[in-house]
């Protein structure tokens, strides 16, 4: 059986609110956004910084319920600045024969990181949202 690594979900254009160099590595995300993106606590995620062009892998930890904070912790805090726009992506392994039917989930947030929309990924669709920290 052959598997492919496929995009499972992403939180699109979240705004970094904090960067905490002194905290152990991770990215803090509200439980509401984690649930919407089907990301578990301690699950590996890729973070792509739209503003700075940097990329890194870390793991998600659960923030406070109702919070709109996106906090990059540990050494990765060097790669972001509060106000940066990021994409937070999770991946899964899928049997090759199931890949054609796979639809990743995209979680859109507003400029304050509040949940705006959840939908399957659509190739070629653009959704520009300004970031106001």
From Swiss-Prot:
Q: Which reaction does it catalyse?
A: L-aspartate + H(+) = beta-alanine + CO2
E.C. number: 4.1.1.11
Q: Does the keyword Lyase apply?
A: yes
Question: Which SUPFAM superfamilies does the record match to this protein?
Answer: ADC-like
* BP GO annotations: alanine biosynthetic process; pantothenate biosynthetic process
Entry GO MF terms: aspartate 1-decarboxylase activity
- This protein's pathway: Cofactor biosynthesis; (R)-pantothenate biosynthesis; beta-alanine from L-aspartate: step 1/1
Enzyme class per UniProt: lyase
Its cellular-component GO annotations read: cytosol
Q: What is its main location?
A: cytoplasm
Which cofactors are required for activity?
A: pyruvate
Q: Which residues form the active site?
A: 26, 59
Q: Which UniProt keywords apply?
A: Autocatalytic cleavage, Cytoplasm, Decarboxylase, Lyase, Pantothenate biosynthesis, Pyruvate, Schiff base, Zymogen
> NCBIfam families, alphabetically?
panD
Q: What is this protein called?
A: Aspartate 1-decarboxylase
Gene name?
panD
């Amino acid at each position: 059986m052959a598997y492919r690594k496929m995009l499972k979900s992403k939180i699109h254009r979240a705004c970094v609110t904090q960067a905490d160099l002194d905290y152990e590595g991770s990215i803090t995300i509200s439980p509401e956004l984690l649930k919407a993106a089907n990301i578990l606590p301690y699950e590996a995620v890729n973070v792509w910084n739209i503003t700075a062009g940097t990329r890194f892998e870390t793991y998600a930890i659960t923030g406070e319920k109702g919070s709109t904070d996106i906090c990059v912790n540990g050494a990765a805090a060097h790669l972001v600045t509060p106000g940066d726009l990021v994409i937070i992506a999770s991946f899964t392994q899928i049997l090759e024969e199931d890949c054609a039917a796979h639809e990743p989930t995209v979680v859109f947030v507003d400029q304050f990181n509040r949940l705006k929309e959840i939908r399957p990924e659509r190739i070629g669709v653009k959704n520009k949202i300004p970031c106001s920290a």
